[in-house]
A protein has these predicted regions:
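C-terminal substrate-binding subdomain of Rossmann-fold SDR/epimerase-dehydratase oxidoreductases
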Residues: 1-2, 227-343
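Non-catalytic terminal and boundary segments that flank Rossmann-like NAD(P)-dependent oxidoreductase
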Residues: 1-29
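N-terminal Rossmann NAD(P)H-binding glycine-rich loop of SDR-like oxidoreductase domains
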Residues: 30-48
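Conserved glycine-rich Rossmann-like NAD(P)H-binding loop of the short-chain dehydrogenase/reductase
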Residues: 51-63
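NAD(P)H-binding glycine-rich loop region in Rossmannoid oxidoreductase-like domains
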Residues: 81-119, 130
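Conserved Rossmann-fold NAD(P)-dependent oxidoreductase catalytic core, especially the SDR/UDP-sugar
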Residues: 99, 125-170
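NAD(P)-dependent short-chain dehydrogenase/reductase
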Residues: 151-159, 182-239, 244-255, 280-285
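Active-site helix of classical SDR
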Residues: 172, 176
Length: 343
């Protein structure tokens, strides 16, 4: 379990401290997509508080037991096997809802575009329907992808609108996330649902799934194995990245302190780097090298064509939140924790 490692325990404690989530005491938080990169860390953080009830859902009970099974003995924790494309049971209630269930890696966009689109749209709708019934607050986890492609050197503020190529396989993810955000605002306007949106940059960390095909995850996986880091492009793309601990802390901070019907970018300007620099950092930490290779056609179809995707985080910083980790620190911690778990 991740919680066995002292650095991960420190990360979880950092997330609880930075997020300032004392007002969650005695409340129930529902998290869908509980076994994913963010879901695992989020649940570990909520359970660390000691006075928050957590309902976690996912499609695989076996995966849940393997990744968040340390909480099963707690009376404050419950896991329910559930498909996010289906409505929630009428008996379910919660004070806060965080619908994380989503396909978030390129191979899924290429091989399962229909499922990628439907889980984003239907998952958001069913979460919002539950919020109407329970008078719950929704924190919707969105993505930098909703901005489309930047014009020149532009940085994405929350009101930015870029261009998007609908003819690519990847549009199943970006357009369905845009639709889900529109649903959030529609439910806020029509039904009075309290909803805040967290637009995440590219998130990485030790809780990533072994099947994750994002470039950053592949770099880190190979680093943990002591292998050379394979870069399948020139690596000149400039992106915002966020360590998973900072992402979880920011999400909870937005949920508790953000304004209703408002979107907040989650990024860390210390982690705005080119893809080749991320690869080199992973190689340096692992004592290996960066090598270049060509992607397969299936891989290429799911790749982002964006050359620049930098999130402006000033709106988030104005709420008092501050990220904690540099790129080097985050990569080192990820490799350290994953190396321990491989033993």
């Amino acid at each position: 379990m991740f919680t066995d490692h002292p650095s991960y325990k420190a990360d979880v404690q950092r997330a609880t401290d930075v997020a300032d989530i004392g007002r969650l005491s005695g409340k129930t938080v529902l998290v869908t997509g509980a076994t994913g990169l963010i879901g695992v860390h989020l649940i570990d953080t909520l359970m660390q508080l000691g006075n928050v009830n957590v309902i976690a859902t996912g499609r695989s009970a076996a995966s849940a037991r393997a990744r968040i099974g340390s909480h099963y003995a707690s009376p404050r924790f419950r896991f329910a096997e559930h498909d996010a494309c289906l409505p929630f049971d009428e008996s379910l209630t919660a004070d806060y809802i965080i619908p994380l269930a989503s396909n978030t890696h390129p191979l899924a966009y290429s091989q399962h575009p229909v499922e990628t689109a439907t889980v984003n749209v239907l998952g958001a709708k069913h979460a919002l329907d539950l919020a109407v019934r329970c008078h719950a607050t929704v924190l919707y986890p969105s993505t930098v992808e909703v901005y489309g492609n930047a014009r020149g050197e532009d940085v994405f503020t929350e009101d930015y609108t870029g261009t998007l190529n609908l003819s690519t396989a990847r549009s199943c993810y970006t357009e369905s996330k845009r639709c889900a955000e529109a649903l959030c605002l529609s439910y806020a306007a029509q039904y009075g649902v309290e909803v805040k949106t967290a637009r995440l940059s590219r998130v990485f960390g030790p809780t990533m799934l072994p099947t994750d095909t994002k470039a950053s995850s592949q770099f880190l996986t190979r680093a943990v194995r002591g292998e050379d880091i394979v870069l399948k492009s020139e690596g000149t793309q400039l992106y915002s990245y966020t360590y998973v601990t900072d992402a979880v802390a920011a999400m909870l901070h937005i949920m508790m302190h953000g304004e209703n019907a408002t979107a907040y970018n989650i990024s860390n300007r210390e982690c705005d780097v080119r893809l080749k620099d991320f690869a080199q950092t992973a190689a340096d930490c692992a004592g290996t090298h960066v090598v270049f290779d060509l992607p397969t056609e299936t891989e290429r179809r799911g790749y982002s064509i964006a050359q620049r995707a930098i999130l402006d985080n000033r709106r988030l910083l104005a709420t008092g939140f501050r990220p904690a980790y540099t790129m080097r620190e985050a990569v080192e911690r990820t490799i350290e924790i994953l190396s321990y778990l491989r033993k």
